[in-house]
Amino acid sequence: MPSPFSHFELVVIGAGPAGHKAAIEAANAGRKVLLVDRDPTPGGECVHRGTIPSKTLRESALYLSGLKQRAAGIATAELGAQTKVESLMKRLGHVQQAHERFMRGQIELPGVSFARGRARFTAPHELELALPGGGRRVVIGDHFVVATGSRPRLPAEMQIDHEQILDSDSILSLIYLPESLTVLGAGVIASEFATIFQALGVRVTMIDKSARPLAFLDPELTERFVKSFQAMGGTWLPGRKPISCRFDGVSATLTTLEDGATVCSEKTLVALGRTASVAGLNLEAAGLSTNERGYIPVDANMRTHVEHVYAAGDVIGPPALAASAMEQGRRAARHMFGLPLHTSVERIPSGIYTIPEMSCVGISEEEASKRHGSALVGRAYFSELARGQISGDTEGMLKLVAEPGSGKVLGAQILGEGATELIHLAQLALVGGMTIDTFVDNVFNFPTLAEAYRVAALECIAQRAALRLAS
């Protein structure tokens, strides 16, 4: 029999970035909160199988491959199939444990309880938790946040066995580096792993039906990204749709393309999207359902069509980034308890941890032109900056977009090492309603990559002056 029920003002299902942030926000507002997760520690996919592991692997790849040193003209050893994976996994474990401790510490607040178990709705305001020891617990909630994340989509025709044909979870369990790897997909996960393994000396072939990877980004950035990937030795096959993949039973994986071609490699990573993790939740009992893509639909405040139930993070679909998930969880908690909201979705940066990094915030040149008729666009290439020449990061660039009349900053897109850090200057400019003149009227350290803002702003100012003269 289930144990006697407990009552909470908010029950959060899933302790990843979205759920974790929702719980903290509600607790800070003085609410009684229960945070539920199937794992023994908070963190979710982000810490255990997603963001933290892949980004740690990326940093290890940069270090072990000597890419930074090579860019500066320093000789390094070659990597390949003999590279020890144990050291990579050991470092990954240390980072995961440290972040788990951090997240655990953050929820040690008055009013927050953490429970391990698998949750399922039994009524609109009632959950039943299946506990690790076999018992059950009934929980009553005034409000709910569903933040159960997502899992890799596993097309049946790809014959994923998690040993030869992998998904984005099982690739983190490799015990050695393969000589070759086929990556199916062109989204964030596919692009990140393709460049990481190429940097580690694996021969990578990336295949997708789309014309370019990361199609939601500015084409200028993705064009440079592809050139960089190819310069590392990677192969990019655009406009080629994979229709099946199988292991030959001996030593190779065979990917068949729609045009009849076959691509052979030692292992294959299938990264053809993700789907919401809602199996077993019994959403129907709460009056919930998923849309045609398998995600839980929400409004701008993360509320579902059931008034007391919210959803946040990967479970609601794109952009499926940790930073946006955190803000969605925070937004859900603040809205349900009537707390003020100030954050705009356009001010949340996106970070893509490929090699090299890419990041953007605000709107693109294309979107700015649609909204304002035209746009001021300034570019700065790292090859023109003293810091870029010193570090050898000459492939990077920054693109700044501003209103044609006022010069108000509308967005920025960056490619290059440190892009995910540099983007925050543009984010602050957006939040503060600043103009391009701000970047020229203030002094930057020299030499730094942040100078790219000043260079790009000067180009925007020149365009603005030309427009004024023409009118």
Residue ranges and their predicted role:
Residues 2-8, 24-31, 37-177, 205, ...:
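Glycine-rich flavin
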Residues 11-13, 119, 139-149, 183-184, ...:
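Short hydrophobic core segments
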Residues 23, 27, 194, 198-199:
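Gly/Ala-rich phosphate-binding loop of Rossmann-like dinucleotide-binding domains
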Residues 231, 257, 291, 298-300, ...:
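Short, acidic, Ser/Thr-enriched surface-loop or helix-capping motifs
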